[in-house]
Regions:
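Conserved N-terminal beta1-alpha1 strand-loop-helix module at the mouth
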Residues: 1-66, 74, 260-268
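Hydrophobic faces of well-ordered beta-strands that scaffold small-molecule active sites
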Residues: 4-10, 27-29, 67-71, 93-95, ...
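Catalytic cores of alpha/beta
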Residues: 13-22, 76-88, 103, 124-138, ...
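Glycine-rich phosphate-binding active-site loops on the catalytic face of alpha/beta enzymes
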Residues: 27-37, 89-103, 139-154, 203-224
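Acidic (Asp/Glu)-rich catalytic clusters
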Residues: 19-23, 52-64, 83-88, 108-113, ...
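C-terminal alpha-helical cap/extension of soluble enzyme domains
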Residues: 78, 176-268
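Glycine/small-residue-rich loop that forms an oxyanion/phosphate-binding "nest" at active or ligand-binding sites
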Residues: 64-95
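Active-site-adjacent beta->alpha loops and helix N-cap segments on the catalytic face
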Residues: 35-58, 75-79, 97-116, 126-129, ...
Length: 268
């Protein structure tokens, strides 16, 4: 099985411990607030209010898991914020809404090898930058494609419809071609969601993705009964393992998934 990592957003140390026991590979602390309310506040999206103290608390309970921290978009406070999250225990720093190569270079310089660096590609400009000759990926360890903001920029109604846009698809294909580890979007339990977890898993495998965020549909399972949560995480991983061993089935399910995405977007 390829190095496929499950991530989940949390700032609760007790919950984080349960996530690690359930096989979640990365704990995700989300510090991003700058500009997010303006971009996403009118949509049914989660805007976290996490803190540096949350990074410290999760670092103490992460055990074998990695701790990913999404910081705010680059500005005059970025150096202090990056230094603080690394000192608090971040293993991976995720930069949202970057504007140009200069910001990437500056974050690489600030991190200085103390943590992994994951730029978040969530604009068409970022997609174009990544596919251009101007993109210098020295110091970039992996990428994540933020379908939420991409689908808003594309004026689409269904988040996964972003994957059908040629510019987004080209950027994802480029990541696969150059061997850059990447992930995109979120994933629901196997039989849940407008686009169920099994269908989303097939898209990830076909496109070469190796990371995914467990969606908020998993959270009630954890709150109600941790055993059910563990079972659903294990079930999703089993589906991924099965699909990895059957390229034909993966291709067929991914094709059906695209048809479902198109139908959902058209019906909105």
């Amino acid at each position: 099985m390829q190095d496929f990592k499950f991530m989940m957003i949390t700032n609760n140390p007790v919950e984080a411990s349960e996530l690690v026991k359930a096989g979640v590979d990365r704990l995700f602390v989300d510090l991003e607030l700058t500009g997010k309310e303006l971009r996403q506040g009118h949509r049914d999206t989660v805007i976290s209010h996490h803190s540096i103290q949350d990074v410290e608390a999760l670092s103490a309970v992460k055990q074998s898991a990695e701790l990913l921290v999404r910081i705010n978009p680059f500005d005059e406070n970025s150096k202090a914020e990056i230094d603080a999250v690394i000192e608090a225990g971040a293993d991976i720093v995720m930069l949202p809404m970057f504007r140009d190569q200069a910001q990437i270079d500056e974050v690489v310089r600030i991190i200085d090898g103390r943590a992994l660096f994951c730029p978040l590609i969530e604009t068409l400009d970022a997609c174009a930058w990544f596919c251009s000759d101007e993109a210098n990926l020295m110091g970039v360890d992996e990428l994540y494609f933020g379908l939420n903001d991409l689908h808003l920029e594309l004026n689409l109604r269904f988040m996964f419809a972003s994957l059908l846009d040629s510019r987004v698809a080209s950027a994802i294909a480029h990541a696969k071609d150059i061997g850059m580890p990447f992930g995109f979007g979120g994933i629901a339990p196997v039989d849940a969601g407008q686009l169920d977890g099994g269908s989303v898993a097939a898209l990830h495998l076909e496109l070469g993705s190796q990371r995914v965020i467990l969606s908020r549909m998993f959270r009630p399972l954890l709150s109600e009964n941790s055993t059910v949560f563990v079972e659903e995480v294990s079930r999703l991983r089993s589906v991924i393992e099965t699909l990895e061993g059957d390229a034909i089935a993966t291709s067929q399910l991914a094709r059906q998934s695209r048809q479902m995405i198109h139908a959902i977007e058209s019906d909105h």
